[in-house]
Amino acid sequence: MLYNKEQGTSGASSSGRRTKFHFDRFVQMVLFIAANPNYCCSVASIPKSGVTPDLKRADILEQKIKSLNSALSPKLKEESRLGGPLHNPSILPAPSFSSLPISSNGKKSLAGYRPKSRKKQTILPNGQPKECATCGDTWTSQWRSGPNGNVELCSRCGIAYRKKMEKKIRSQQSSDDGTKNFIFKNK
């Protein structure tokens, strides 16, 4: 079990909900395939190549699903009792090609895929979430240093502050260069 020190046990999402979502999605896909016999070819339409389909794999898959449900059941009950996930919900596996949506022509598509947000909430020792000094946002992918040198700005405000400071420095340097050139030209 992983534990996120920054989030504690008050995570916004639950692994149980994610697991249920994926299981429900799997069931919907199976029901869709069962209801649409033309969606994929039947075993009878496969040309005889001397290889018979391995029906034992379907039985093995069914056993794996049953064992997964029985293994997850106690964990999901404990999560619902505690009111939060027992692992770090911000650490998610990378999407595989098999998890991508299926387009109307039956091929995998990247069109509907959006990567998960990497924003997280930092909890201070007093139990309060850390807030951005500029906008007050508590969720960010990275905390950045601000005008006081402390790490007090969210990523968006920190980048804006850095760009503003870089622009100010560039304008000072260009005005300094212009003054020096003007002085040297007069001599």
Swiss-Prot record:
Molecular function (Gene Ontology), one example: zinc ion binding
Pfam families, sorted: GATA (PF00320)
Domain of life of the organism encoding this protein: Eukaryota
Gene3D superfamilies in UniProt: Erythroid Transcription Factor GATA-1, subunit A
InterPro entries attached to this UniProt entry: Znf_GATA (IPR000679), Znf_NHR/GATA (IPR013088)
Chain intervals annotated as zinc finger (GATA-type): 126-180
Induction or repression: Expression is regulated by the KAR4 transcription factor and reduced after pheromone induction.
Name of the protein described by the UniProt record: Protein ECM23
